[in-house]
Amino acid sequence: MEKSGKVVGVCLSQRRTDLKKNVGKGILIKGLGLAGDSHAGSEKEVSLLAIESIQRLCQETGISARPGCFAENITTEGIDLTSLPIGSKLQAGEAQLMVIQIGKDPSQPHTYSYQGYSILPREGIFCKVIESGEIKVGDSITVLRTCKVI
């Protein structure tokens, strides 16, 4: 498992039903999530998805997609997100995150579909912010600890 990678997208939307836009940088706030995002303050504060998952789907289906198209807040490169156990801690730019959920039930409300495809439920992870800080495209994202919370 790769222990570090980089941030290739910092994405937000004003409304839950809108496509997220890669704004390049943002502030992750403890107990809230990505400042300015429609999902900030929810139980799943921040969502992460690997660009490799997006690229694989594009290659398999012929669609074109970019960071944010699948409703993720942070698009990563070079780190195997779904292999991280719940409770893992990540350093993402200046902020620290804790993995609280791997994937999600695709039948849940607000499961976003882009051109009929929804990969966040099976290949994304959800985190809470445990230390506030800035995050921007090009920042490293590093696994600090992978011990499971009981």
Residue ranges of predicted features:
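Metal-cofactor-dependent catalytic cores
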Residues: 1-150
